[in-house]
Swiss-Prot record:
Role: Binds to DNA non-specifically. Could be a regulatory factor involved in maltose metabolism.
Protein name: Sugar fermentation stimulation protein A
Gene3D superfamilies xrefs: 2.40.50.580, 3.40.1350.60
Record-stated family: Belongs to the SfsA family.
GO MF term set: DNA binding
Domain of life according to the entry: Bacteria
Pfam families (alphabetical): SfsA, SfsA_N
Species this protein is from: Salmonella arizonae (strain ATCC BAA-731 / CDC346-86 / RSK2980)
Gene (UniProt): sfsA
UniProt DNA-binding region: 201-220
InterPro entries documented for this protein: SfsA, SfsA_C, SfsA_N
Amino acid sequence: MLFSPPLQRATLIQRYKRFLADVITLDGTALTLHCPNTGAMTGCATPGDTVWYSTSENTKRKYPHTWELTETQSGVFICVNTLWANRLTKEAIQEDRLPELAGYNILKSEVKYGAERSRIDFMLQADFRPDCYIEVKSVTLAEKENGYFPDAITERGQKHLRELMGVAAAGHRAVVLFAVLHSAITRFSPARHIDIKYAQLLSEAQNKGVEVLAYKAELSATKMELNKSVPIML
């Protein structure tokens, strides 16, 4: 997926109030960007890092510029806009880049399901096959080459795993897909040191038939593409 129009470059001064970030552009202009990430963003928002941002054509937006990528001072790319995890996953499914999810001719988004009244990110359907429910999670927390999710305790994520176990018990396919949006990560694990309950639920879910996938995106300031399976260590 190409960034169109091209992203613009700036230097990060600070992220604050979760949804805002101050930057300095190449010509020295000070801007405040919208930060579309509610997580801790550990390692993704170090002052002095390069920020790549987009600009909305909507003139009514209070903050028309959106922080899309971080390029660290060591050259690592991280996608901080969590909306891209679903966009890249959808594109990869439609282009048959995820072999585990190939062979379906109908793709639906934000379908209501489950005992806890959730919405699944994607549902795949095809004749003579069980429906496939897919929950997507964005992975940006890294320690060396290890990627972790979540980066903070996530009751919502725990709920999604319970819902997926219900889907599997009903005879459908249930999938949690971890979209790795950090160029230095080469393997994935649940973040036991942050949310032990989520890690325990993920292991339980896998034992009860939920499929656990992890795919990494190729990242640059011009394009992103989810295309590489990475090892999972539960």
